[in-house]
C-alpha cells in the first residue's frame, strides 16, 4: 500500500499527465474509486501533501488547460463554452470565475489579448 507522499505523486501524475481533469464528470469520488481508497483519504492527501483541496487543484489544472487552448491558433474559432467543456468545466461561468481567481483576467479578456497580439504581427 502507498503512503501519502507516494499517493500524492501518483495522483498528480494521473490528473496532470493523463489529463483526466478534462472529463467533466471527474470527481473526488471517481479518483478514490480508481485508487481503491476513500474520498476522505483523497481529501486528506490533497490537504497534507499537495497543500490545497482536491477541487481547487483540479479546477486550476482546468484553468491552465483552458488558457493554453485560448492561446492556441488551432482553437481560435472555438467559443468560450467550447473551451470550457474541452477543459473539463461544466460551463463557461465556472471557467470565468477560476480564470479570474488564478490569472486575474477573464477568458474573454485573454482572448482579446491574443487577438491583439496576432494583429500586431
Each predicted region: which residue ranges?
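Append "Primarily bacterial transcriptional regulators
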Residues: 27-37, 42, 46, 82-89, ...
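Basic, amphipathic alpha-helical hairpins
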Residues: 12-26, 46, 50, 67-78, ...
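N-terminal positioning helix adjacent to the helix-turn-helix/winged-helix DNA-binding module
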Residues: 3-11, 27, 50, 59-65
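HTH DNA-binding helix-turn interface
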Residues: 43-57, 99-109, 113
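Inter-domain helical "communication" segments and dimerization helices
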Residues: 1-23, 41-44, 68, 112-121
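Sequence-specific DNA-binding recognition helix
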Residues: 73-111
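Terminal helix-turn-helix DNA-binding modules in bacterial transcription factors
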Residues: 49-53, 57-86, 113-121
Amino acid at each position: 500500500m502507498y503512503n501519502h507522499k507516494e499517493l500524492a505523486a501518483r495522483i498528480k501524475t494521473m490528473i496532470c499527465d493523463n489529463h483526466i481533469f478534462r472529463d467533466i464528470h471527474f470527481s473526488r469520488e471517481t479518483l478514490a474509486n480508481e485508487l481503491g481508497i476513500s474520498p476522505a483519504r483523497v481529501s486528506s492527501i490533497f490537504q497534507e501533501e499537495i497543500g490545497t483541496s482536491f477541487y481547487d487543484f483540479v479546477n486550476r489544472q482546468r484553468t491552465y488547460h483552458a488558457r493554453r487552448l485560448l492561446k492556441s491558433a488551432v482553437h481560435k474559432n472555438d467559443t468560450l463554452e467550447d473551451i470550457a467543456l474541452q477543459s473539463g468545466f461544466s460551463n463557461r461561468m465556472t471557467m470565468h470565475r477560476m480564470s479570474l481567481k488564478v490569472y486575474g483576467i477573464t477568458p474573454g479578456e485573454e482572448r482579446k489579448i491574443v487577438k491583439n497580439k496576432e494583429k500586431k504581427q
